[in-house]
Amino acid sequence: MRTAQVSRNTLETEITVSLNLDGSGTSRLATGVPFLDHMLDQIARHGLIDLDIAAKGDLHIDAHHTVEDTGITLGQAFAKALADKKGIRRYGHAYVPLDEALSRVVIDLSGRPGLEYHVDYTRARIGDFDVDLFLEFFRGFVNHAGVTLHIDNLRGINAHHQAETIFKAFGRALRMAVETDARLGDVTPSTKGAL
């Protein structure tokens, strides 16, 4: 089983992430940021990743540190669970619609952090959640998972729908990329022989 548990403790946050890449999509999420929990649940359900995240952060200031550090810790756990990446498909992609909204996510588990994030939300907040924090979440994930990630919201009017299509597509792209391919066996999917 490809599993990992990582804890990150700073003066701003205390976060523990446990995940199983070969799970069934169950989640237990308690970040203290309800809309973030809702989006993390999309990753679990659509990625078939069992995800347990507990976070305590300086929410009396705002959600920035909690959201960013959750992305960082999730990225660290993801990298640890993938280990040497032998036999994985490596690349994943997904288009996901939700009513009027449509997003595309493409990922390469390359070992090289890179983020292209092209999302123009139709409003700055979803409830009391600042949508700018999603960029911080994905930047934290990418830098600590060592992946290249392209996120494009192609259209959308409802900001909630825009965010949800992004996270659903992210989960589905992850699911595709981490799948093992029996034809690869123990081969690393790179001409360099390592990722």
Curated annotation (Swiss-Prot):
Pfam families: IGPD
Keyword Cytoplasm listed: yes
Gene: hisB
Gene3D superfamilies xrefs: Imidazole glycerol phosphate dehydratase, domain 1
EC number annotated for this UniProt entry: 4.2.1.19
This protein's name: Imidazoleglycerol-phosphate dehydratase
Listed pathway(s): Amino-acid biosynthesis; L-histidine biosynthesis; L-histidine from 5-phospho-alpha-D-ribose 1-diphosphate: step 6/9
Superkingdom as given in the UniProt entry: Bacteria
Enzyme class: lyase
HAMAP family: HisB
GO molecular function: imidazoleglycerol-phosphate dehydratase activity
UniProtKB keywords: Amino-acid biosynthesis, Cytoplasm, Histidine biosynthesis, Lyase
Record-stated family: Belongs to the imidazoleglycerol-phosphate dehydratase family.
Species the sequence originates in: Thiobacillus denitrificans (strain ATCC 25259 / T1)
Cited InterPro entries: IGPD_sf, ImidazoleglycerolP_deHydtase, ImidazoleglycerP_deHydtase_CS, Ribosomal_Su5_D2-typ_SF
Example of a GO cellular component annotation carried by this entry: cytoplasm
BP-aspect Gene Ontology terms: L-histidine biosynthetic process
Catalytically driven reaction(s): D-erythro-1-(imidazol-4-yl)glycerol 3-phosphate = 3-(imidazol-4-yl)-2-oxopropyl phosphate + H2O
Main location: cytoplasm
